[in-house]
Amino acid sequence: MSEIKTVGVIGAGVMGGGIAQSLAQAGYEVTCTDIASEALDTARQDAAEGRFGLAGAVARGKLDSSEADAARARITWSDSFEEAAQSDLIIECVPEKLDVKLSVFRSLDEAAPEHSILASNTSGFPIAAMAGATRRPDQVVGWHWASPAFVMKFAEIVVTEGTSDSTRDQVMACAKKCGKNPVAVRDNPLEWGFVANRIYFAMLREASRVVDEGVATHAEVNDLMVDCFRWPVGPFAMVKGAGSGWK
């Protein structure tokens, strides 16, 4: 089995920047790219000084300063798609629009070396659709991260019928090296979401019904679920926090 040494991240938004930081801290050489220079600047700043950035990790005793400096040096923030595409593993982190993701996968298939694994951080679009946009469906996989990427141990590794065992195993090993607890799950093209989001959104629909029926307010639902199930936040607070990167 080949070893992943370099990782490209396509998209420097809330998730892409955090994923790049996590990978760099795990020892990977990372190239993170975005078409928007402002997104790259924000991601670079967040990785260095943000709430879950390297400076904060040093202050909390999670890293020493030399480890933080080394991680910072392992990230290249670039506006070059082609540069990021020359990696052993490329993780797509563009907005949740299927047509955009398919376009990215077509471009990656053209630009990336033959051995490269192509992964998507989609929250729920079928991985089979993205695999079908390439000539290497056996090397396509989902790697669904949770926000904030650096903190959360969650990792859904989503495999299709065509994903090879080698691809799955390499990405699982990468996730473990990043300190995650990866679980390989099956792609289900007939449903949106894999495991965590299918269950979460079913719960969120019921929470919304409770509010719509006047049983409780949004805030009351949040408080009750925290107190009853010892969740860190309630279902409505989760939506807001995850979308903002918990800033």
Enumerate the language-model features and the residues they cover:
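NAD(P)+-binding Rossmann beta1-loop-alpha1 motif at the extreme N-terminus of oxidoreductases
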Residues: 1-56, 111
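Rossmann-like NAD(P)-binding element
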Residues: 35-38, 42, 56-118, 125
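Rossmann-fold dinucleotide-binding core
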Residues: 117-187, 194-197
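Long, compositionally biased
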Residues: 242-247
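Helix N-cap / loop-to-helix initiation motif
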Residues: 3, 36, 64, 164, ...
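Internal alpha-helical scaffold of NAD(P)-dependent oxidoreductase catalytic cores
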Residues: 26-28, 136, 157-188, 203-231
